[in-house]
Amino acid sequence: MGVQLKLDPNSKNWLRQPDQQPIQDSICTLPGPGSLLKKKIRKTEFRIDNGLLGNTSPIINVESKIPFHRRANSTPEESRKRVSFSLTSNDGAKSDRSSQKSSNSRKSIRSQSRSRSSSVGSDSQASIQSGTNSEVVSDDEEDGNFASIPELHEDNEYHSNLATSSNPFSDGSSSKSASLTASSAAASPTVSFSPASTSENLTPTSSKSLASNTSLVQSFNSASRSSSISGNQYTYNLLGKSTDESPKITISAGTSMSHFPSASSKLIQMRRHAHMNSEKCDPELLSHNEYFPMMKRGFISRFLCLFVSRDANVYIGPLESSHAKPYRPFGSFVSRFTNRVASDLESQIPDALEAVLTQNNDYDFNSFLHNMGYSRCYVDENYHITIHVSSYERRVEFMLAVCEAMMLYGSPSHKIQQSLRIASRILQLPATFLYLPDCMFVYFKKLEQYSPDVFVVRVTSQTDLNRMVLVNEIFRRVMRDKLSAEDGTEVLRNITSFRPLYRDWLVAFMHGVASASILPVVYGGGWRDMLIGFVLGLLLGIFRVYINPRFFLFDSLFEVIISIILSFLGRAFGSISRYDKPVFCFAALVEGAITLILPGYVVFCGVLELQSKNIVAGGVRMLYAVIFSLFLSFGITIGSALYGWMDKDATDADTCMSIIAVSPYWYILLIPIFTLSLLIVTQSHPRQWPIQMFVACCGYVVYYFSSLHFGASQISSAIGSFAVGCLGNMYSHFIKSSSFAVVLPAIFVLVPSGFAAQGGVSAGLDTASQITSKNTTTNTTTVTTENSQNSSLEFGFTMVEIAIGIAIGFLASSLTVYPFFGYRRKNMML
């Protein structure tokens, strides 16, 4: 760790007239993006008040390299020394006025600086005080005051460097001198710079001639620093010689009260890094073990760390900073049960950050929506980019990053192309786009200074609702001139570097919960079937989460292999009988196990693409969904046939007995459980859970009662999707956010219902029965006319019919909502 202090008078505003007022907007300069976690050197610039040094106003640059992680073996009895910097005058009135103005320093920081920083109490206080005037300046705005809080451990070195390229004290003032003081809670360690009041060596001529000798670095070794805890002072001469005229650096170290980082302060650091970091952050530095030491964790925090790979509030940190609000689901519990005393740092910074990122705290409704996480686009309206200052390369890079992120996290293709067209118009980049599944061709037309370029973006899509919302919000901010294209690209890089929100074992476990909870509701299973359904679903989750990503060859045949295994085990359990009656339902077990890998979402996106006149992408997706369904049907057939060859008395029932059916009143509990498991599998943030569960439950209620009247699956799916689409469109109108992530879980709830109504597993079971029959010789491609309804091809057509009904319902909802609220194409579903 090193802290370097240098005087830099080469500033445009360093000479001012006595009658001029201090330049408020130049008090603190924002440094460029950097990584605090990677221990980069960050710089804070403080402007000295006009009354301190007469007519001159040099800049003091404070550079610090701070170890982000604290030592794990630290004890409460260990003394910690914290250093922050303040400028005071050494005249006779210092002792009287500094005490009066130090109490007002925190208020002055908030009033004079509209940045994401604030004063940090007795642990870290940055102020500029003088005998006549005072300006309070905040610490490093980009680091959130952490760059000016170094720690003096025994294994670190403390450097002090004062370098001058010209004489800043040539005004002839003999009654004032500058003092740079480091304050602490207990015995204050000080770092003071005291130039001589009158000296021939401080003339501009002599200082230029001694420019090569004005840099001096002194270090404390571990022995001297450990013995200086009682308050010993160290004095170093600026020019390397001990004279009365040469400026000196005086450092006195003292003990301070023990202080340990609380969870909130660590979360603030993570949020600040995620917001401003320009490079991909190290995933290992963003784990719970780094921010909540085991010795200080409470039971609740340890328990939550088993389920989430990082704190949920930090994960959504690049867009919002509601630290001190009671609506955060995980962070509040973690902070509350860590057995730490909140410091001034964690109690003051959140308010300043919240005041900056919210548009107007006077509007209770908007503040409530912001705090609940439904809309994270309320920022300071005074900040706009009216002219795009980003270069051509940066704008192109942003468009490609947005395209890649949207494709990666499962955004619908028509939404991707529409967003890219809007971006090309606002960013003044004429471009043409051609989308194919998992591939986007971007052609930038020729401009005056640039030649035409063609880019191909190819990624494998996955469903991540949390990061889908984050990418959409970043895109909206850039399009509304809240962020520049360069800053938007940096935040997108941070988002893509994040690990999944939930741990792998939890995702695999929720596969089992989803299978068990959907069995009685959709497929007619009983309570006994739920246990076996959980085991089969857990097996699917293990293969999908652990085995599939690690073996490339297995990935190519994942659907066939897993359907064979599940069908084999399902028929084995279904063949268990008691008193000549089956104990378990074979059809419910198999259909419930493969629920989460049904291609309903793929077909739904294909139908939306066909409706948006994207014939190529829509046709490819529809064909892929049919082939995918054939894979599942083939696997079910092979698995059932394999067990049929082993057990001649294997069950042939493709439906469940009505006597084992669960009462419909239990659906009130089982549908929310199934929806919650879907939200965790799709990596949805807890802030999104309430509205997503509400929409999904409403959609199923409408589907359930409509199916009692109409019976046909296509009509019931269309009516249920109509209700879901209306709720999603109203959400996008009032909340001003994309509704696709809200209605997507409802689609996953509607697809299994229609799939069961069409008898999805009956095709494979019927073919398997024909294969194992003693009197019939057939194969999987031989289908008679009377059995055409149960053919393998019907399995794929079933998914197409369901998806068409859902898509028609969404289109009808858009047409219905339009007369009442207008058409907001950038937010609505279609």
From Swiss-Prot:
Compositionally biased residues, Low complexity: 100-130, 186-199
A Pfam family assignment: ThrE
Heme is among the record's keywords: no
PANTHER family to which the protein is assigned, alphabetical: DUF1212 FAMILY PROTEIN, PHEROMONE-REGULATED MEMBRANE PROTEIN 10
Coiled coil regions, renumbered to chain: none
Main location class: membrane
Keyword NADP: no
Family that this chain belongs to: Belongs to the ThrE exporter (TC 2.A.79) family.
Alphabetical list of InterPro entries matching this protein: ThrE-like_N, ThrE/Ser_Exporter, ThrE_2
Cellular localization per UniProt: Cell membrane; Cell tip
Organism, as annotated: Schizosaccharomyces pombe (strain 972 / ATCC 24843) (Fission yeast)
GO MF terms, alphabetically ordered: amino acid transmembrane transporter activity
GO cellular component, one term: cell tip
Keywords: Cell membrane, Membrane, Transmembrane, Transmembrane helix
Membrane topology: Multi-pass membrane protein
Polar residues bias (residue ranges): 10-27, 200-210
Protein known as: Uncharacterized protein C16A10.01
Lineage, highest ranks first: Eukaryota, Fungi, Dikarya, Ascomycota, Taphrinomycotina
Chain spans, region Disordered: 1-28, 70-147, 186-210
Membrane-spanning parts: 505-525, 529-549, 551-571, 584-604, 622-642, 659-679, 691-711, 715-735, 740-760, 802-822
